[in-house]
Amino acid sequence: METAVQHLINHGIRPSVQRVAIMHYLMEHFTHPTVDTIYRDLLPEIPTLSRTTVYNTLQLLQEHNAVWALSIDKRNVHYDGNLKPHAHFLCRECGQVFDIEIDDHLKSHLHSYPGVKVEKVELNYFGLCPNCKAKQVESQN
């Protein structure tokens, strides 16, 4: 598995303490965090970290295709360190964003356009996550 430092270098980004910590966080947390979530979680580890540094680092990572910025939620931008083909699901009740695997047929279709290089595909599903669906069923009974 590629380390955060290797990932940064492979995408042409000079590693720094903050960049490595943010990239490592995204590689370890598949929760599609926002700037505020990353800032809150890393602040105890890096007391000098600022929200602006997190935002600017994420912008840099996105510009170098080291992470994806998801505009699945109208209120927040979520960040994804998983660059393998997959879809996303947004729960309309709790706001949780999680990965959904896509089948091999769709994956093979992504590479079937001659002369183009597909760099990113956004496939988003919206609805209720299992927890919110269960709560809805309980409230109806």
Features from the language model and the residues they span:
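Basic amphipathic alpha-helical segments that dock to polyanions
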Residues: V54-H64
